[in-house]
């Protein structure tokens, strides 16, 4: 489909994927909003091929060694424990191979809890070069004493640019591997 629409997609691995004949393709359904009714997305991924696939059969080094950049989304690890394992292995392998790694937390409340997302995504940070968004990540003021709170505690949902700069600097201080942080800014009217 990409090539037929003149989307440049080289290099994309086009070899035959592993087959999982007993599992279906995951999907999602978008109910487009109208007027004051917001759009709604329903994920149908439980027991889908990706959630049941044995990722230990993949040679990640062989798969990634020809690339310079790996982008991962926080949606994949939200799908199932094996997907979390795959995401972490991809991060570690990419770091080992010297790839630039970008990561977008993409929190989806219908796929996992806020705390699950924060705990897992925070574990990803030491392997990330380009971070998209500042949530969902823990940024404890004191790594030993979490009762002192998160740097982001008390910051409004739509922080000012000055507050964002303070948070971004705290991330860079804590994770010097981060070369770039970008935050999504979206306003609903």
Where is each model-derived feature located?
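Anion (oxyanion) recognition and catalysis
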Residues: 3, 92-96, 125
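Conserved phosphate/ATP/ADP-binding segment of small-molecule kinases
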Residues: 97, 111-189
């Amino acid at each position: 489909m990409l090539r037929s629409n003149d989307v440049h997609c080289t290099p994309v691995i086009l070899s035959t994927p592993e087959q999982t004949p007993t599992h279906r393709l995951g999907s999602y359904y978008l109910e487009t909003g109208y007027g004051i009714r917001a759009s709604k997305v329903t994920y149908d991924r439980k027991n889908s091929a990706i959630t049941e696939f044995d990722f230990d059969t993949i040679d990640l080094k062989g798969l990634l060694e020809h690339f310079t950049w790996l982008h991962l989304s926080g949606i994949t690890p939200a799908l199932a424990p094996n997907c979390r394992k795959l995401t972490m292995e991809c991060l570690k392998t990419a770091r080992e191979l010297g790839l630039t790694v970008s990561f977008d937390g993409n929190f989806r409340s219908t796929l996992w809890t806020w705390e699950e997302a924060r705990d897992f995504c925070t574990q990803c940070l030491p392997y990330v070069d380009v971070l998209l968004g500042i949530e969902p990540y823990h940024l404890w003021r004191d790594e030993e004493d979490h009762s002192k709170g998160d740097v982001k505690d008390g910051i409004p949902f739509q922080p000012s640019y000055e507050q964002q700069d303070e948070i971004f600097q705290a991330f860079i201080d804590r994770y010097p591997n981060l070369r770039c942080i970008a935050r999504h800014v979206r306003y609903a009217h």
